[in-house]
Swiss-Prot record:
Keywords: Calcium, Metal-binding, Transferase
Gene giving rise to this polypeptide: TRI101
InterPro entries according to UniProt: CAT-like_dom_sf, Sec_Metabolite_Acyltrans, Tri101-like_N
Binding-site list for CoA: K253, F266, V267, S268, T269, D302, Q318, R343, S386, K390
Pathway(s) where this gene product acts: Sesquiterpene biosynthesis; trichothecene biosynthesis
Protein's name in the database: Trichothecene 3-O-acetyltransferase TRI101
Amino acid sequence: MAATSSTSSQSFDIELDIIGQQPPLLSIYTQISLVYPVSDPSQYPTIVSTLEEGLKRLSQTFPWVAGQVKTEGISEGNTGTSKIIPYEETPRLVVKDLRDDSSAPTIEGLRKAGFPLEMFDENVVAPRKTLAIGPGNGPNDPKPVLLLQLNFIKGGLILTVNGQHGAMDMTGQDAIIRLLSKACRNESFTEEEISAMNLDRKTVVPLLENYKVGPELDHQIAKPAPAGDAPPAPAKATWAFFSFTPKALSELKDAATKTLDASSKFVSTDDALSAFIWQSTSRVRLARLDASTPTEFCRAVDMRGPMGVSSTYPGLLQNMTYHDSTVAEIANEPLGATASRLRSELNSDRLRRRTQALATYMHGLPDKSSVSLTADANPSSSIMLSSWAKVGCWEYDFGFGLGKPESVRRPRFEPFESLMYFMPKKPDGEFTASISLRDEDMERLKADEEWTKYAKYIG
């Protein structure tokens, strides 16, 4: 295994987006893996040098991508201010040759199994774990903005890119990966790309004047736990990929469109699939939960459009919508009614106002530890979903001479009950959902007749 980098000679001090200042986000890395077939092993050295040169070009124009996230001014009752400051000359690249490792995946094995989650172990294919677990995660350890790992496997390679989540959301990470692919091809960056990458993060969300906290933040401020109550131990959970063909998605969208609420004129494929997942998980959870158990659907929303910011802005600019009901109501209502609930919260003006309210509240708060986008989600009955369907990773070739990726996956990390992701949508329209559920819910879901009509288990 080799890692390449050198100490930075640059000088910069970039305060993170106010929404990126949430303490939980500052300890997380978001990972994404792109898989390419390699027919000629003699290409590997050239691939490494191409990526190294691309990282140099990217860092010359945007030195902060090689920086680190550092929190300054921490004291009693103050979580400090997190910034990107210099770290190295280029983002660190780890090169790992797994071709002689019998436990490592091969391109043929991945293909035959449908690129399952279990074959993308973050401890093998990623340069750093998602969660701050294990060595290197102390308060004084560096948190690089960007980390990469190039894994050589028999017949192919897996390129994993880790982004520090306080510094970027997945849309921002995708913008950086796209520019890295351009840099590897020795293509120039446009003025628009340069301008978006260098936007002042402190002013992206204008603060509200004379703001008083209202119900718009109810789901985002953690309530103090009752004295003496220990939090329940997390349930034993597992991760799995499920895929949905374009035909299955079209049928789900048709079913939702036929049963829409009177208040809705339209739902997207993403709305219909999200609703189907909420309904299906609620249905299987009725086996262990009371019908009147509250359920909440927390759905990440890219705020670049509503805030009038470039779609390629690289920071963290997302919020969530929240939908409350009971397990039985969601399990039993028409699909279109559930999809309409999800669509109803996507009003741009309302989203913008809610995001400004959150930013304004956080700006005036010395101790931000009570703020979380999933502050009141109960993993036993709720869902927390991020859709990466629009992320462009299927298009990037990095000038490797290998064509476009054969698969794009998020590596497997510790199970986290009710956390879910939609992978970047395949060019043919197929969606893959990465779903974490407690074991008994997962087993019931895999056997559920309505679910298996549309979803294929990959593992």
